[in-house]
């Protein structure tokens, strides 16, 4: 999950900050980031929102970091 770690660092966030933003326990987040644990759809959504990116970017389906426009 290099993409996830790189984007988190690019945003200047620690794993503890990600815990606060996503509600995902820091130890679980660390396992997700190192590939020792998969994230659920809901966790992926929370991570994407916290990092201001798309779930597609996190999944490696696109190289575009900017999220799609949000539906109002």
Please identify what each model-predicted range represents.
Residues 23, 42-57:
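DNA major-groove recognition helix of helix-turn-helix/homeodomain DNA-binding modules
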Residues 8, 19, 48:
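The alpha-helix within a helix-turn-helix
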Residues 10, 49, 59-72:
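Short, charged recognition helix plus adjacent turn
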Residues 3, 14, 40-43, 54:
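Residues that mark the N-terminal boundary/hinge immediately upstream of a DNA-recognition element
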Residues 1-10:
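A short, Lys/Arg-rich alpha-helix, primarily the initiator
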Residues 12-34:
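Short alpha-helical DNA-recognition segment
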Residues 33, 43, 62:
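DNA major-groove recognition helix of helix-turn-helix
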């Amino acid at each position: 999950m290099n993409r996830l770690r790189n984007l988190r660092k690019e945003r200047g966030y620690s794993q503890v900050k990600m815990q606060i933003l996503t509600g995902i326990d820091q130890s679980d987040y660390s396992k997700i980031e190192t590939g020792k644990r998969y994230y659920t759809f809901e966790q992926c959504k929370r991570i994407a929102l916290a990092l201001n990116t798309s779930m597609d970017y996190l999944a490696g389906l696109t190289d575009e970091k900017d999220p799609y426009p949000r539906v109002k």
